[in-house]
């Protein structure tokens, strides 16, 4: 099991838990919209660090982005396994061809 899979399992386990017991439970209790907002905030912070060129800060912000992405997915009952399946289906396909095939 990868660290992302363990993180996704932990996030899933926080659903329905007392919001005062964990940050993840609190985010999930606030609903998908709040989870999406937090994901967006963290993505912007990662972008800022990418522009600044601070590798350590970028790695830290990227970790926050991944965490908040998993929380946002969980808030809408989309599993990490589902996302990984989409990526696996796209593997080996040109990005241009894959994008054209969506239309």
Curated annotation (Swiss-Prot):
Its EC number is 3.6.1.31. It comes from the Bacteria. Its main location: cytoplasm. One of its GO terms (molecular function) is ATP binding. GO terms for biological process: L-histidine biosynthetic process. The keyword DNA damage does not apply. The keyword Acyltransferase does not apply. It catalyses: 1-(5-phospho-beta-D-ribosyl)-ATP + H2O = 1-(5-phospho-beta-D-ribosyl)-5'-AMP + diphosphate + H(+). It is found in: Cytoplasm. InterPro entries: HisE, PRib-ATP_PPHydrolase-like. Keywords: Amino-acid biosynthesis, ATP-binding, Cytoplasm, Histidine biosynthesis, Hydrolase, Nucleotide-binding. GO terms for cellular component: cytoplasm. Pathway: Amino-acid biosynthesis; L-histidine biosynthesis; L-histidine from 5-phospho-alpha-D-ribose 1-diphosphate: step 2/9. Belongs to the PRA-PH family. This is Phosphoribosyl-ATP pyrophosphatase. It comes from Cereibacter sphaeroides (strain KD131 / KCTC 12085) (Rhodobacter sphaeroides). The lineage of its organism: Bacteria, Pseudomonadati, Pseudomonadota, Alphaproteobacteria, Rhodobacterales. The gene is hisE.
């Amino acid at each position: 099991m990868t660290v992302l899979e363990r993180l996704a399992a932990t996030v899933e386990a926080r659903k329905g838990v007392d919001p005062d017991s964990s940050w993840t439970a609190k985010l999930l209790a606030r609903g998908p919209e709040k989870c999406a907002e937090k994901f967006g905030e963290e993505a912007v912070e990662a972008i800022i660090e990418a522009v600044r060129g601070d590798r350590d800060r970028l790695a830290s912000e990227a970790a926050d982005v991944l965490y908040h992405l998993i929380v946002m997915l969980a808030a809408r009952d989309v599993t990490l396994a589902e996302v990984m399946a989409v990526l696996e289906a796209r593997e080996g396909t040109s990005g241009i061809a894959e994008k054209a095939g969506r239309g």
